[in-house]
Amino acid sequence: MNEQLHNRTMAFAGILQAIAQVQYLARHGESDTDELAASLHTILVTDPETPADVYQDKAGLHKGYQLVLNQLGDSSQKDVEITRYLVGILALERKLARSNSGLSMLAERINQVNRQLHHFAITDEQVIANLASIYSDIISNLGPKIQISGNPLCLQRPIVQQKIRALLLAAMRSAVLWRQLGGKRRHLVFARKAILDTAKKSLTL
């Protein structure tokens, strides 16, 4: 398996996995704690030796790879809402990459959260609130806001809003890695078959 393509597909699966949790939270007001923790942990791995170090829960990416197949395959499973969120995240990532001040502030704020983890679990409400505020303060202001659709009763709850923003930050983290590994939007069209083949193989590893 082409290592660069494997790593790039892994990062793309990470984006989709975080986005899918946003969608589920917005509709149902709850999330799987293990999946949430796995996505949020990726935010804090800022200096990985290898791309795989970002995704310490390898089994947790299973759903992400399945989403790659659903979104890029000739499938009735393709979700237009997931695609809309993906386009929004990739657009914001481009804005972030061009903002030296944004990148500097992001690194500083993530270091603060890392220190907080000496005392709290990553799924603690206080940690989630801090991750959410990083997204609101730094990422959300870079460009058009991503409009989240869902159940209004769920979306009114502060903890749901905070988890959604924290997960959007996790999606951004994977988008940054995807771009660092050479990922480009045109690959999703012109290299679609290779990405699909890689996702299928990754599901069986």
Swiss-Prot record:
UniProt xrefs under SUPFAM superfamilies: YcfC-like
Keywords: Cell inner membrane, Cell membrane, Cytoplasm, Membrane
Gene3D superfamilies in alphabetical order: HflD-like
Recorded coiled-coil stretches: none
Cell location: Cytoplasm; Cell inner membrane
Protein's UniProt keywords contain Lipid metabolism: no
Bilayer topology: Peripheral membrane protein
Database matches in Pfam families: DUF489 (PF04356)
InterPro entries recorded: HflD, HflD-like_sf
GO cellular component terms, semicolon-separated: cytoplasm; plasma membrane
NCBIfam families: PRK00218.1-2, PRK00218.1-4
Membership in a protein family: Belongs to the HflD family.
HAMAP family noted in UniProt: HflD_protein
Name by which UniProt lists this protein: High frequency lysogenization protein HflD homolog
Lineage per the UniProt record: Bacteria, Pseudomonadati, Pseudomonadota, Gammaproteobacteria, Alteromonadales
